[in-house]
Amino acid sequence: MGSIGSQRLKEPCVAATSDQSVVTSFSFDNFQLETTAEGAQDPGIRVRGVPTFTDSAVEEPVPDDRYHAIYFAMLLAGVGFLLPYNSFITDVDYLHHKYPGTSIVFDMSLTYILVALAAVLLNNVVVERLNLHTRITTGYLLALGPLLFISICDVWLQLFSHDQAYAINLAAVGTVAFGCTVQQSSFYGYTGLLPKRYTQGVMTGESTAGVMISLSRILTKLLLPDERASTIIFFLVSAGLELLCFLLHLLVRRSRFVLYYTTRPRDSRPVQAGYRVHHDVASGDIHFEHQTPALSSSRSPKESPAHEVTHSNSGVYMRFDVPRPRVKRSWPTFRALLLHRYVVARVIWADMLSIAVTYFITLCLFPGLESEIRHCVLGEWLPILVMAVFNLSDFVGKILAALPVEWRGTHLLACSCLRVVFIPLFILCVYPSGMPALRHPAWPCVFSLLMGISNGYFGSVPMILAAGKVSPKQRELAGNTMTVSYMSGLTLGSAVAYCTYSLTRDAHGSCFQTATAAAANDSIPVGP
């Protein structure tokens, strides 16, 4: 019986024999049984009641991403959690016209980063407690609401006074920051469960959001001379794109491909096919029942006891199977939360520092300092063009991050630190105020191009590599931990950028002062 049934039986009480003795109890060390037909030369030779069979596919085959639909959905996911913020800061011409002489772009950037840092820390705490898709859905709703509210109530209907509108815009940016950051942090944990290319897809989507928003603003400004009308259309287009990303997420999360990767790491062990032994006490017949993984996992503990006696028309059956461990879900303690994060951080510390330094340097300059670059001929078009160049080159950099290059964490960190050279170069484009050292508009465009490519590449590669350095069960936590580092760099960079506002305070009136001085010189009478 033992050689035919399981790989190894333990503690048998009475063995079933050819003289119709009854097996009363036994237990298994393993679910899977060897095929009984392997040792039989004649198909008719078998123990009474035991059928010959072969095991079917034990593990579910890996599903394909047909037509790269899942990759495209993840790219749009990246669009979704940066598109709202980009919408607020890219209409820089409207902001300068409505709030002249204020630091509105700097205030929006700092508000976004401070709220985003708090949101990513909160999300990192509740990552084991709240459902992944609950967090993502909440993020989408918090991002869509302010976009629609500002476009309708402030830009279109103009229901608020100047000071009220200023405060409401900052509050809207803060709400967007909270929702989008929870969404972003959750998506990095989400894609950490998928193959590496999907993390790269999400990060490419972030840059795609910047490109799409920049093109949208340029087109609406060109096609609609009325600044207010173009801004309304601009915000409504952004809200429509955000809604599209949300609906696509709801479809993709139920796909077979995503479910295959996101459900496996949560199990304590892989769910494999098993067998149940049925022994007919009356007739002595014994047969094996094959259980598929889906069937095994769908049964409740009451439906799958270790030892059950059932009655049927053919007699009494005694069923023997292996009890599955009952896992009691409990919230981890604060000490356990810290320990989990410490274990992950020890493995990916270089990647954490690399992404933090990369975004620290970028946020020192973008969008704050870049939005204040002025030119007497191009006017408000120059900051729009400079930001568009950055978004486009950042998009290219994140595509380059998909190249199969093996990086050591320390090398990535060193290259990220070299980007500090962009800070003095951009300062020379705005300082001295009114007559900067690098006045030609080509300079900020070239610097923005190089900074965007390097930001896209060195901001993506650490995030892509980090998830592969930890076990599958730790990948969601690794993605969230990397997002904490990412947001820390953004916060410090925004704080430094806010301090540079004084360098550009007089830039708005520089062209007017130059024109006035030129007119005064022309009016001075010239002697004979």
Curated annotation (Swiss-Prot):
Residues glycosylated per entry:
521
* Further facts: Other than a moderate activity for adenosine, PMAT does not interact with nucleosides, nucleobases, or nucleotides. Mediates the uptake of clinically used drugs including neurotoxin 1-methyl-4-phenylpyridinium (MPP(+)).
Q: What is the lineage of its organism?
A: Eukaryota, Metazoa, Chordata, Craniata, Vertebrata
The record, for SUPFAM superfamilies, names: MFS general substrate transporter
Q: What is its main location?
A: membrane
Q: Which residues lie on this side of the membrane: Extracellular?
A: 1-68, 123-139, 188-231, 368-376, 433-445, 505-528
Q: Which UniProt keywords apply?
A: Cell membrane, Glycoprotein, Membrane, Transmembrane, Transmembrane helix, Transport
Task: List the GO biological process terms.
Answer: adenosine transport; cellular detoxification; dopamine transport; dopamine uptake; epinephrine transport; epinephrine uptake; export across plasma membrane; histamine transport
Q: What is known of its domains?
A: Glu-206 is essential for cation selectivity and may function as the charge sensor for cationic substrates.
Indicate what this protein is called per its UniProt record. Equilibrative nucleoside transporter 4
Q: Name one Pfam family in it.
A: Nucleoside_tran
Influence of pH: Optimum pH is 5.5 for adenosine and adenine uptake. Absence of adenosine transport at pH 7.4.
**Lipid bilayer topology:** Multi-pass membrane protein
Q: Name one GO molecular function term.
A: nucleoside transmembrane transporter activity
Loss of function: phenotype: Knockout mice are viable, fertile with no overt physiological abnormalities. Knockout mice show an impaired uptake of serotonin and dopamine in choroid plexus.
Protein purpose: Electrogenic voltage-dependent transporter that mediates the transport of a variety of endogenous bioactive amines, cationic xenobiotics and drugs. Utilizes the physiologic inside-negative membrane potential as a driving force to facilitate cellular uptake of organic cations. Functions as a Na(+)- and Cl(-)-independent bidirectional transporter. Substrate transport is pH-dependent and enhanced under acidic condition, which is most likely the result of allosteric changes in the transporter structure.
GO CC list = apical plasma membrane; basolateral plasma membrane; presynapse
Activity regulation per the record? Answer: Activated at acidic pH.
Q: In which tissues is it expressed?
A: Expressed in heart. Expressed in choroid plexus.
Give the record's family classification: Belongs to the SLC29A/ENT transporter (TC 2.A.57) family.
* PANTHER family (UniProt xref): EQUILIBRATIVE NUCLEOSIDE TRANSPORTER, EQUILIBRATIVE NUCLEOSIDE TRANSPORTER 4
Where, in residue ranges, is this chain on the Cytoplasmic side?
Answer: 90-101, 161-166, 253-346, 398-411, 467-481
Where does the UniProt annotation locate this protein? Answer: Cell membrane; Apical cell membrane
Residue ranges annotated as transmembrane are 69-89, 102-122, 140-160, 167-187, 232-252, 347-367, 377-397, 412-432, 446-466, 482-504
